[in-house]
Amino acid sequence: MADRDDIPDYHRTAVPASTQIPKQGEKLNILLVTRGHPFDRDGFFDIFDGNPQIQYSNVEHPAAQYMFTPEMADKFDCYVQYDMPGIKFGSDTPEYFEPPEFYKEGLRAMGEAGSPLVLLHHCAAAWPAWPEWAEIVGGQFLYTPMQSRGIDCPDSGYNID
């Protein structure tokens, strides 16, 4: 079982949002996974609040990492990810971190089980130190020049202020 030492230091001090697993019924049960970048929270959640066919829970990193198991995924119809973990922005260049091993194993097992994921926008920039993530997403956004799929690549063109 994972413990606190498996969570990167920059996530340990984070205060995650609370979540409840919705009751299964006629509505779609969606797990919204967020954190790692600023966004219009009201606008984002309004999309889901305004759809009477959806009920959702929101979980933020690092707590979200514990939700990535086939057993947990069975409680939801789909995960919608609008997260960007694995990057710590500072005064200079960003620092990159791999996810904990328990998260990697859980995500792989979800893939093998056919658990549906919807990966939005910022997910392409998540986990840059973990090459397998680019394969899962089907692409990669690079904040700095680095290798992607074994090829030296320039950054993707975003100017970090």
Predicted feature residues:
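A conserved amphipathic helix/loop scaffold
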Residues: 40-46, 51, 101, 147-150, ...
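Aromatic-Pro/Gly-enriched surface loop or interdomain linker
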Residues: 2-78
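Short, surface-exposed linear patches
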Residues: 52-56, 78-81, 102-103, 139-143, ...
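Short, surface-exposed, polar/charged, turn-prone segments marking secondary-structure boundaries
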Residues: 58-62, 84-88, 139, 145-149
